[in-house]
Structures are given as C-alpha cells and as structure tokens.
UniProtKB/Swiss-Prot annotation:
Binds 1 zinc ion per subunit. The lineage of its organism: Archaea, Thermoproteota, Thermoprotei, Thermoproteales, Thermoproteaceae. Zn(2+) binds at residues 108, 113, 138, 141. It comes from the Archaea. Contains catalytic and regulatory chains. InterPro entries: Asp_carbamoyltransf_reg_N, Asp_carbamoylTrfase_reg, Asp_carbamoyltrfase_reg_C, Asp_carbatrfase_reg_C_sf, Asp_carbatrfase_reg_N_sf. GO terms for cellular component: aspartate carbamoyltransferase complex. One of its GO terms (molecular function) is metal ion binding. Its cofactor is Zn(2+). This is Aspartate carbamoyltransferase regulatory chain. The gene is pyrI. Keywords: Metal-binding, Pyrimidine biosynthesis, Zinc. One of its GO terms (biological process) is pyrimidine nucleotide biosynthetic process. It holds the Pfam family PyrI. Involved in allosteric regulation of aspartate carbamoyltransferase.
Length: 151
C-alpha cells in the first residue's frame, strides 16, 4: 500500500474518518450536504484501513460540524472519528457517540405510525434505548429501529 495522499489536506474544516465502507453517502445525506453549499467536499470510498478492512473518508473544507451533527453521524457510522482541522493540523479529534434523541432526520419504518400520515405535521422522533449496537425506539408508535432500519 502506497503512503501517497489520495486527497489533498485541507486548511481548515472537518475530516470524518473511519466511516464503514459504503456509508459515506448516508453520512452526507443525514448532514444535509448536497455539494451545492459552495464549500469543497472530498469523498473517498473503499480505501484500505487497518481497523476496518475498508473505510470511507469525508473532508469538508471551512466547516466545523455542530455537536448535534457529530452525534447524528453515529446512527449510520458508529465507528467514525471526527478530526477538526485548523491551519492544516488536527486540533481536536474524537469519536462519535449515539445521540439520546434524534428528531426529523429519519422516517419511522412503521407505515401506520402517525409520523407517516400525510396530513399530520408530526416530526419523527427516536430515543436511544441501547448504545452498542445502537437501537432506537420511535416516540410515537414504539417501534424499535436498528441502524439498518434508519439508513
């Protein structure tokens, strides 16, 4: 394996590393990143990793994620590591943790849940009931959701 950089370093922003292979697009989706924001975004998928075998990496230039955004990433990428970059250096590094509450990011998979009724302005809300592996429960219908249900 070569030690050359696949994607250049960023001056400032956020690097999301150790994303399970194939989940980077789901991370971008839950963060609401479309590519039209006007900031440079680098996406590398299926690169070799000692810890995961294969992994994805996302670099977002000139944007630091909020704590809420960081923790929501754990719903689709529980092994992710967040690196905050300033002046080409990592100034903070931490792992994501599942949030206690998720509001409005995912749809309940129960077709009869009130959050799926077209005339009901109810925001889907999920509560964390287990951290490892993450398990959430819908606040309205009580249906349990694992990661594969929410992605």
């Amino acid at each position: 394996m070569s030690r050359e950089l696949i994607v250049s370093k960023i001056r400032s922003g956020t690097v999301i590393d150790h994303i399970p292979a194939g989940r980077a697009l789901a991370v971008l989706r839950i963060l609401g990143i479309t590519g039209k924001e006007g900031v440079r975004i680098a996406l590398v998928m299926n690169v070799e990793s000692k810890k995961l075998g294969k992994k994805d990496i996302i670099k977002i230039e000139d944007r630091e994620l909020t704590p809420e955004e960081v923790n929501i990433i754990s719903a689709v990428a529980p092994t992710a590591t967040i690196n905050i970059i300033e002046d080409f250096r990592v100034v903070r590094k931490f792992k994501v943790t599942p949030p206690e509450v998720i509001r409005g990011k995912f749809k309940c998979r129960n077709p009869t849940c009130i959050t799926n009724a077209p005339r009901e302005p109810v925001e889907p809300t999920f509560y964390l009931v287990r951290r490892e592996p993450p398990l959430f429960i819908c606040a309205y219908c009580g249906r349990y959701h694992e990661l594969s249900d929410l992605i």
